[in-house]
Structure formats: structure tokens, C-alpha cells
């Protein structure tokens, strides 16, 4: 029997605990890595609905949106992420997302 893939392992974790932010983010990133952008965006959406202060989710969702030429949605995602970064005091995320928003504007 073959070893389970990262995606399969993350899906198993989420079956047991659907609100696991780390596993949800990891699954979204695996989809993005494989070019499955719609699936990635779906997972990022679930993540951010359950964990609105998970700042990396906003940044990576925005990058995925840019990949599929949805720049206006990416800007809105970054604005929401910047608000989350301010709420949580995450200066690094604030800087990254502000820089990306400036590039898109």
C-alpha cells in the first residue's frame, strides 16, 4: 500500500477536526501548489470564515486570486487581511500585504 499524500493526510485531519486552522491552511496551500486554484480558494474561504484573524490565509488567497487574474478580489482580500493584521498586531503580515496591495493599485 502506498504512503498517503500530504493532501490525503490533511483531509484526514480535517475529517476529525474541521476547524483545524493549520490543516485547512495546509490543504489550501497543497491545492495552490498543484495549480488547483478554485479548490485552493475554496479552502482559504473556509479557513477565513472560521478563523478571521489567520493573516497568512488572506495573503496566500490574494496571491492565488492574482494568479487567476482576479485582481480586484485580491485587493479586497488584502484589505481584509490588513485589517486582521492590525487587529492581531502582526506587523510582518501587515507589511507584506500592504506592499502587495500597493503593487496591485
What are these regions (language model features)?
Residues 12-13, 46-47, 81:
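Canonical positions in the second alpha-helix
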Residues 16, 50, 84-88:
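Structural marker of alpha-solenoid helical repeat scaffolds
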Residues 31, 65, 98-101, 105:
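Residue at a conserved register position within TPR or TPR-like alpha-solenoid repeats
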Amino acid at each position: 500500500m502506498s504512503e498517503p499524500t500530504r493532501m490525503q493526510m490533511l483531509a484526514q485531519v480535517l475529517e476529525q477536526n474541521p476547524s483545524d486552522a493549520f490543516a485547512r491552511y495546509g490543504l489550501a496551500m497543497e491545492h495552490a501548489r498543484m495549480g488547483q486554484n478554485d479548490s485552493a480558494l475554496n479552502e482559504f474561504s473556509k479557513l477565513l470564515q472560521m478563523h478571521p484573524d489567520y493573516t497568512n490565509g488572506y495573503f496566500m488567497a490574494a496571491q492565488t486570486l492574482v494568479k487567476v487574474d482576479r485582481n480586484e478580489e485580491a485587493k479586497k482580500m488584502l484589505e481584509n487581511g490588513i485589517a486582521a493584521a492590525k487587529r492581531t498586531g502582526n506587523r510582518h503580515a501587515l507589511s507584506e500585504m500592504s506592499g502587495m496591495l500597493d503593487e496591485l493599485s
